């Protein structure tokens, strides 16, 4: 128990009057953690809640529920249970979907019962497997360190207090304390890469050193420190701004970054904004204007760079529609309001035109022209280029018409005709 109690001291985890939610499966690891907690917390019957999700992947999964009911009843601990309906099981990627459903259940339970800490029974062998798995799949140090020792899930702090324990140590703990548990038979199969690493690779590595768990923990701490340093450096830079369907920044803000830093910076931006790991390694090898990586696109255009999540690009509504002033309306996945008055919201532009209560809005068709102050017309694509708007984003720029003439194009153009009777229209966006 010394290593267990040290975890809370080292990480400044307050215990008194705090609520703990244990994600339990009925396996040897979570049973050991349950037993440690009921012997560690000052008032476990009031401080501890156990959450169990039956994934409905095995016929005998009901045995886990029976065991947890027996354990929690014996110690007067609240047990919350839920099943993952078979109808929701996907044909592919079931592990990822199961994890997603499980953490949604835990987040909901934590919020409902105002929990302070969520605990999982991940241990040192899990950490080793995770490092090897992510090394094989990506080689990204940030991904290899994805099993954080202390993290967050919604409003709860996520704790993994068994991370310095090996699997063998936990099995010995269960045996010494006479604890029953359920073995998941699928863990003994070789159908997944994680299981093959567990059965064949990790045992070989353990033969080479008695400090494998300790070394994995040290690697995790070192990787976390390096990641924090890198993130602090990137946060010190001038960061891009939200630009409708993209992030937009100035190329001049990147001039002090070398190619490796540049690639890492864009990886960082994608993860910060969309919580996906991508690698713009191609920046290191090729000089070009557009880079595509999975569902993301990086564009260098004129004086700007753009990061676009193409999954967030909604179908273009090509038809004009009539809207009323001072009433919110949606267009191409964005919400706007146009008013003569000042409103609460993000003012993205304004224009002057004849007074009316109704306007036409939509996307500017290709080939359109815009009227200049001297009465001549210019091609809209020229104005888009002057303002550094790439082709893929142009249809998402709000256009407003009066009397069939464009009087406003978001981030590009405002009516240049003058008339003493014109009034000002303010354009607000609500993201």
UniProtKB/Swiss-Prot annotation:
GO cellular component terms attached to this protein's record: cytoplasm
Reactions mediated catalytically: cytidine(34) in tRNA(Ile2) + L-lysine + ATP = lysidine(34) in tRNA(Ile2) + AMP + diphosphate + H(+)
Catalytic activity, EC: 6.3.4.19
Alphabetized UniProt keyword annotations: ATP-binding, Cytoplasm, Ligase, Nucleotide-binding, tRNA processing
Localisation per UniProt entry: Cytoplasm
One Gene Ontology molecular-function label: tRNA(Ile)-lysidine synthase activity
UniProt keyword annotation of Ligase present: yes
GO biological process: tRNA modification
Domain remark from Swiss-Prot or TrEMBL: The N-terminal region contains the highly conserved SGGXDS motif, predicted to be a P-loop motif involved in ATP binding.
Role: Ligates lysine onto the cytidine present at position 34 of the AUA codon-specific tRNA(Ile) that contains the anticodon CAU, in an ATP-dependent manner. Cytidine is converted to lysidine, thus changing the amino acid specificity of the tRNA from methionine to isoleucine.
Protein name: tRNA(Ile)-lysidine synthase
Organism: Lactobacillus gasseri (strain ATCC 33323 / DSM 20243 / BCRC 14619 / CIP 102991 / JCM 1131 / KCTC 3163 / NCIMB 11718 / NCTC 13722 / AM63)
């Amino acid at each position: 128990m010394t290593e267990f109690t040290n975890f809370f001291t080292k990480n400044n985890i307050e215990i008194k009057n705090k609520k703990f939610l244990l994600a339990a499966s009925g396996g040897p690891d979570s049973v050991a953690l349950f037993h440690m907690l009921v012997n560690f917390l000052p008032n476990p019957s009031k401080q501890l809640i156990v959450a169990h999700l039956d994934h409905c992947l095995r016929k005998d999964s009901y045995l886990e529920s029976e065991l947890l009911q027996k354990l929690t009843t014996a110690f007067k601990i609240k047990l919350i249970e839920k099943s993952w309906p078979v109808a929701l099981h996907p044909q592919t990627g079931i592990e990822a979907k199961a994890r997603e459903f499980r953490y949604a259940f835990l987040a909901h339970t934590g919020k409902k019962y105002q929990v302070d800490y969520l605990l999982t029974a991940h241990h040192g062998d899990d950490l080793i497997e995770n490092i090897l798995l992510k090394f094989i799949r990506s080689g990204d140090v940030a991904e290899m360190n994805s099993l954080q020792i202390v993290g967050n899930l919604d409003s709860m702090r996520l704790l993994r207090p068994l991370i310095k324990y090996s699997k063998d140590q936990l099995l010995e703990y269960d045996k010494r304390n006479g604890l029953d548990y359920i073995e998941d038979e699928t863990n003994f199969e070789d159908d997944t890469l994680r299981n093959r690493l567990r059965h064949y690779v990790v045992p070989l590595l353990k033969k080479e050193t008695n400090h494998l768990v300790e070394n994995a923990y040290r690697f995790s701490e070192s990787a976390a420190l390096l990641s924090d340093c890198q993130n602090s450096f990137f946060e010190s830079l001038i960061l891009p701004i939200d630009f409708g369907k993209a992030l937009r920044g100035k190329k001049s803000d990147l001039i002090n970054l070398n190619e490796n830093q540049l690639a890492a910076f864009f990886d960082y931006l994608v993860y910060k904004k969309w919580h996906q790991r991508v690698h713009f390694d191609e920046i290191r090898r090729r000089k070009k204007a557009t880079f595509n990586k999975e569902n993301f696109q990086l564009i260098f255009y004129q004086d700007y760079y753009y990061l676009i999540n193409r999954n967030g690009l909604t179908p273009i509504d090509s038809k004009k529609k009539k809207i009323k002033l001072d009433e919110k309306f949606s267009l191409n996945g964005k919400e706007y309001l146009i008013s003569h008055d000042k409103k609460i919201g993000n003012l993205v532009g304004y224009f002057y035109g004849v007074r009316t209560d109704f306007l036409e809005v939509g996307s500017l068709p290709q080939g359109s022209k815009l009227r200049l102050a001297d009465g001549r017309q210019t091609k809209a694509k020229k104005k888009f280029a002057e303002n550094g708007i790439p082709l893929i984003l142009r249809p998402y720029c709000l256009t407003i018409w009066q009397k069939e003439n464009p009087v406003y194009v978001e981030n590009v153009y405002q009516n240049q005709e003058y008339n003493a009777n014109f009034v000002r229209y303010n354009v607000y966006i609500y993201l």
